Amino acid sequence: MYWKWLANHRPAAPFPGTVAYWEQRYAAGGDSGVGSYDFFAEFKAEVLNAFVREHGVQSVVEFGCGDGNQLGLARYPRYLGFDVSAAALARCRERFRGDETKSFRNVADYAGEMAELALSLDVVYHLVEDEVFERYMRQLFRAAEHHVIVYASDTADNRGFEGTHVRHRKFTRWIEVNEPRWQLVRQVPNRYPYRGDYRTGSFADFFVYGRR
């Protein structure tokens, strides 16, 4: 009984860092999370596909492509996906094998590639370390020719998330200060807002940026 009690009361392992967390998660067979599946994924695809169609977007770059499930609903003429996880990238390459409109690379190999639209979906609030967040945001806007779409929470309230793989950020303020050539042109609230259960609601909304 003691060993059973001990197993159930061991302290949680310390957070290993953003990059290590996601590589370990995907390597162990984990996925991108509920936000990339089912009705959440359908809502996101509806908004993104409409934007691409309405603005005649021909090229898309995404930072944080994950396991590729969300991408399976996308209708992008040309797509380049980056991720920190080699395991996630391997899944994407296998899933979209033979699709010449899509390519995938490790974000460590980013070499200044640009696209008309740069995407960040369910990523910003998973960038726990300040330096990782800063590097990610600068890379995201550097890669965009005309549009940036961020799907994330926009708050600095992290009560209950300390020590986890989630860190909410007031990222719109960061953009105002650090990317003044870009302006928020539209915000799309989530069709399924968070009401206490992450399986049925999300704390992320869409934030659409364009060049001034």
Describe the residue ranges of each PLM region.
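A conserved beta-strand element that flanks and buttresses the S-adenosyl-L-methionine
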Residues: 119
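Class I (Rossmann-like) S-adenosyl-L-methionine-dependent methyltransferase catalytic domain
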Residues: 1-113, 130-212
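Short catalytic micro-motifs in class I SAM-dependent methyltransferases
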Residues: 122-126
